[in-house]
A protein has these predicted regions:
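Beta-alpha junction/loop-to-helix N-cap segments that form part of ligand/metal-binding clefts
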Residues: 156-161, 174-233
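Short beta-strand elements at the ligand-binding edges of bilobed clamshell
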Residues: 233-257, 361-373
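Short beta-strand segments enriched in small/hydrophobic residues
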Residues: 138-157, 267-268
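Extracellular/periplasmic periplasmic-binding protein-like sensory domains
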Residues: 333-404, 414
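An alpha-beta-alpha
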Residues: 165, 243-298
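Periplasmic-binding protein-like
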Residues: 194-207, 225-228, 265-270, 316-329, ...
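Alpha-helical protein-protein interaction scaffolds
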Residues: 1-129
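Segments of small-molecule ligand-sensing domains
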Residues: 391-457
């Protein structure tokens, strides 16, 4: 209806300013019905009626965002309809899509595009997201500093991560200098690394040491830093990325999974503690983006509390996301089998333990949980080796996988930081980075089916 009223307007009676607003409304209407190409065409018309430089630049960024969100088949099947402006946009997004896995070629393709379309609005106001790619330099490491707790209370954590890092390094000739953060203060380690000419640092792992870097970013100026943890104080710092096995990542993955599974009114049951608050908040932030509303976050002290969360809830409350131990999850499943048998249960990796028995899984039919994709590879020689060296302890195996992925990430540091949408397939998940260079992990989902754990589609 709104579009019909727009089309009925006599554009000859509108000023350029009014026309720009007209086409912006038209673009938003097309975007709402998921018609990306029509939205882009409307924004091209909008640009023709804009004089303010900032509004033109914002419009370019919005147009680029639309194209980036589009299915590649839609882009590839679109016609420029004889429009140089539309043709330029389509050529630009195709150059991006075709070269996303080869950032050096992508940089060259963008330069070529600017030469081919010198008068295009996107050449004048190059999309902000692509600016850093014009002068992209592939990651090229001379040596690496690895910062881990290798003695004291954190020794088992540090040595397990180091084992994964070293195995991923394999025969690489890049020298690695190891620093023990249990015996040397982080600021001294950074000074020693700089004195040794180290330009890339993996670590630290402990949160207080990550906070020390955040509090004094000038100390690591000129270095690429991949921390192995994130904290509440995490902020965007040039050449610093944050990576870790955060339960918040799992919560975001759960929100995505439940939304894709058609669940629209989930109950999110979190333990009544700091972990529960952080994870519940992470789920809610992602749910707001997906659904436009807050998720129903509830906090429990005892597993039995969860049955009360379903009293008076909408009939379509078909899903529960819960962070719990294996024993707590078994209790929750038992209660819901009696009171709400149709509720689909989604859980975090906290419930997935090596100590879970066949008898345990026999009671957990239908439960889905997120964990690292490495656990899909149980028949591989690498998995068998790691299971042997860690005693099959899942938490240590996750840390090993994290160490392996730390090697992968530091060797693709520039790509991760500078290439929008760049992803890496790691042992801990599909890895990508947001605008703050927080490394996101898209988890693998598993389901208990007839007593067996099988990987399912995300």
């Amino acid at each position: 209806m709104a579009e019909g009223k727009l089309r009925a307007l006599d554009l000859t009676k509108l000023s350029p300013s009014q026309k720009s607003r007209y086409y912006e409304t038209f673009a938003q209407t097309a975007e709402n019905r998921k018609d990306v190409i029509e939205a882009v065409k409307a924004r091209i018309k909008m640009d023709e009626n804009l004089t303010d430089m900032q509004r033109r630049k914002d419009n370019v960024d919005k147009t680029w965002s639309l194209l980036r969100s589009a299915n590649t088949a839609v882009i590839n099947n679109a016609s420029d309809e004889g429009s140089v402006a539309l043709g330029g946009w389509l050529t630009l997004i195709k150059a991006y899509n075709d070269n996303i896995r080869q950032p050096v070629q992508l940089s060259q393709a963008l330069q070529s595009w600017k030469s081919a379309y010198p008068n295009h609005v996107a050449a004048t106001f190059f999309p902000k997201e692509l600016e850093s790619l014009l002068n992209f330099q592939q990651t090229n490491l001379a040596q690496i500093g690895l910062v881990l707790p290798l003695s004291g209370d954190g020794q088992i954590l540090g040595t397990t991560i180091q084992s994964g890092f070293n195995d991923a390094k394999g025969d690489s000739t890049i020298p690695v200098q190891v620093f023990d953060s249990s015996t040397t203060p982080i600021n001294d380690i950074i000074a020693q690394a700089k004195a040794s000419g180290i330009k890339a640092l993996v670590g630290p792992l402990l949160k207080q040491n990550v906070d020390a870097i955040i509090a004094n970013p000038s100390a690591v100026q000129g270095m690429d830093v991949l921390t192995l943890n994130a904290t509440a104080n995490t902020q965007a710092i040039n050449q610093v990325c944050y990576y870790g096995l955060s339960p918040e990542d799992e919560a975001e993955s759960a929100a995505n999974k439940m939304w894709k599974d058609g669940i629209r009114n989930p109950i999110v049951a979190m333990p009544q503690n700091d972990l529960g608050q952080r994870v519940g908040n992470a789920f809610n932030v992602r749910w707001q983006r997906l659904a436009g509303t807050d998720a129903n976050i509830r906090y429990y002290n005892l597993p039995a509390d969860i049955t009360y969360f379903f009293q008076g809830t909408p009939q379509d409350t078909a899903g529960l996301y819960v962070v719990s131990s294996p024993d707590e999850l078994a209790e929750i499943k038992g209660y819901l089998d009696t009171s709400n048998p149709n509720v689909r249960i989604y859980a975090s990796s906290r419930s997935n333990a090596a100590s879970n028995t066949p008898e345990y899984y026999a009671k957990m039919n239908g439960v889905q949980f997120s964990d690292i994709p490495f656990f899909k590879q149980s028949d591989s020689s690498q998995y068998q080796k790691v299971a042997g060296s860690t005693g099959g302890e899942f938490q240590l195996m996750r840390l090993y996988a994290m160490g392996s992925d730390a090697w992968l990430l530091i060797n693709h540091f520039n790509e991760l930081r500078q290439v929008p949408g760049y992803t890496l397939s790691g042992l801990t998940g599909q890895l990508s980075a947001d605008s703050n260079c927080d490394v996101d992990r898209d988890m693998t989902w598993y389901q208990v089916q007839d007593g067996n754990v099988v990987a399912v589609a995300n």
